[in-house]
C-alpha cells in the first residue's frame, strides 16, 4: 500500500469517526418539529412507557421454572417384551397399531430370523400388513428398530441398555412378584405380567385401573383374558342391579398348552386329550379372580371352562341371581349405556346374529350378545359375552402400560 493510500484511508477513518457526532446532533432538529405539533407531546410518554418494560425480569423466571424441565413429562413410553409367543407377538402388533414404541424383545428359544417369520405370518390373525425384517442384528418392524436378546433369565436381560422400558412378561413362567422382580433388577421400570399372578396387584382396564399406585406398584398383573371379559360385565350388572350369586362358564378356544393329540398331562389328565378332537372340561380361576378387581363379589362368583376345538375367540356365560329385580330389556339397556359411555372400547354391545369367527381381531375385552342371553325371571338371568382371547387381551396389556405410564408421569 502506498503512502497516498494510507493517507486516504486515514482521512476516510477520520471522516467516519466524525460522522457519528453529527448523527447525534441531528435528533434535536426533529424535536422542534415535534414541538410544532402539539400532539407528539403525548408520544414521549408512551416512549417512557416502553421504557417500563424493564419489568421483563418476569420472563426470566419463566425459563427458570423447573417444572417443565422435570424430564419425565416429555419422556416417551418404551416397551420391552419377554417371551415372543402368542401374546408376545400380538402385544407387538398392538403396540405398532397404537403407536407405542417397542425397544427390545427377548426370547431364548427363537432365533431372530425365525422371529421375523413368526411375526409376519399368523394362521389366525393373518399376515402382518407392514414390513418386518432382521437387519444389522435387530428386528425391524415398519422401519422401527427393535433390539433382540436371547437371555434365559430375566436378570440377564440388559434392559438398561435400551433405556429401562416398561416390560411385558409374557413367558407364562415368571408370574410372582419375586420372579418378575428380576426384570426390575435388570433395569426395567415397570413389569406387567400377561397372566394371573398369585401375589401381584391385579388390574382390569375399565374396572379397577384407578387403584394403581405408582409409588408402590412396579409389578402388576393384567389378569387373564377370561377375567378381562367377565369383570366389565359383572361390574355393570353388580353396580346397577346387584349380584347375589353367580356361576360363570367360559367356552374357551384351545391354547398352546394343550395337546394336538392325546399325550401326558400331570396336572389334569383330561387336559392331555387331543384339543382338536374333544370338548374338554377344565378348571379356571377367572371367576374368583374377578373378586380381586371387584372385592364386593368375594364369595359370590365361581366358574369353570370348556376347552373346545376352535383356534380363537371364546365366550363367557354368566348366570346370576340379581338383588334388584329387572326385566331382561333393562339389563340390555344398562350394558348398552356402559358400552357407549364409561366402558367404550372395553365393553361392546351387539344384537346381530353373530358366531365366534365374527370376533376374530376384535380389540374389545367383552362383547355382550343381547340376543343370546335369556332370563328365567326378573331375578335370575343368563348373560352371554364374546371375546377374542388373544387379540383383545393383547390390546388391554398395551392399554394398561399406557395408563401406568400416564400415572407415573
UniProtKB/Swiss-Prot annotation:
EC number(s) recorded for this UniProt protein: 1.2.1.12
Binding site for NAD(+): 86-87, 107, 152, 174, 194, 389
Keyword entries, A-Z: Cytoplasm, Glycolysis, NAD, Oxidoreductase
GO MF entries: glyceraldehyde-3-phosphate dehydrogenase (NAD+) (phosphorylating) activity; NAD binding; NADP binding
Coiled coil: none
Testis-specific N-terminal extension as annotated region, ranges: 1-74
Catalytic activity: D-glyceraldehyde 3-phosphate + phosphate + NAD(+) = (2R)-3-phospho-glyceroyl phosphate + NADH + H(+)
UniProt feature, compositional bias: Pro residues: 53-71
Site annotation Activates thiol group during catalysis: residues: 252
UniProt-listed Pfam families: Gp_dh_C, Gp_dh_N
Residues bound to D-glyceraldehyde 3-phosphate: 224-226, 255, 284-285, 307
Top EC class of this enzyme: oxidoreductase
GO biological process, alphabetically ordered: glucose metabolic process; glycolytic process
GO CC field: cytosol
PANTHER family attached to this UniProt entry: GLYCERALDEHYDE 3-PHOSPHATE DEHYDROGENASE, GLYCERALDEHYDE-3-PHOSPHATE DEHYDROGENASE, TESTIS-SPECIFIC
Comment field on protein domains: The testis-specific N-terminal extension mediates tight association with the cytoskeletal fibrous sheath of the spermatozoa flagellum, possibly via interchain disulfide-bonding of Cys-21 with sheath components.
Protein family according to the UniProt entry: Belongs to the glyceraldehyde-3-phosphate dehydrogenase family.
Quaternary structure and interacting proteins, as annotated: Homotetramer.
Protein's job: May play an important role in regulating the switch between different pathways for energy production during spermiogenesis and in the spermatozoon. Required for sperm motility and male fertility.
Name this polypeptide is given: Glyceraldehyde-3-phosphate dehydrogenase, testis-specific
